[in-house]
Amino acid sequence: MTGRRATVWQESDSSAFLDAVIALDDTTLVAMGDPIDGCLCVVRSEDGGQPWAKVPCAVKDGPGVPASREGEAAFAASNGNLSFAGDTVWMLSGGGASRVYRSLDRGQSWTVFDTPIQQGGQMTGGFSLDFADARHGIVWGGNWEAKEDNTARAAVTSDGGETWTLLADGAGPGYGSSVRYRPGSAGQQLALVGTPGGVDVSDDGGTTWRHVSDSSFYAARFSPDGSALWVSGNGQLGRFPASVLGW
């Protein structure tokens, strides 16, 4: 790399569209995007983002990325399609099918699991996922074209993403574009943005929610120590101290 900019990876397929990127540590990065050649596009770097390598589509039950279903893609709503804990990485799809992919080897090989959230439409499915630890995670999304609909728009897992159960179905906020666990809360405290009403938080793992702000944002991240929630969207960058959120 010379100067301050350089091309470190380029996809030759003109339909390529990357939706999210995540850093597992100082050296390993994983990015994902819409399907190319029959599976979600996944690329990895093991040296801090210099050269990248594309993970191939799996052949039958072999290593790689499992085949995508008709209309399955991903939403670039909040860089929320990827999450990790240790060496385990999860990846979320939406649209024609909304599934959770899991890699136990830092993104090199993947298995995929179904979710019960609404899917099948162009703007339905999961928009964001997060994991509190290697077993407990949450998916949030819904129908972008019917944002008030709070049915089958969120699900949780307690077995590392293999099975999912609908969460607070028909109660609480509707569509959301970014959901995050607060660090240090043992998976009990969450924040949600992208809803029609603004910012909501939960104290019980997502079963019930409190509305804390009418301001609209698209993405959210907690500071590493959980002392503040950072949000962005609509030309704004905001910070909510934990005390303002009731914690």
Where are these regions (language model features)?
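Residue-level hotspots at or immediately adjacent to binding/recognition sites across diverse folds
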Residues: M1-W247
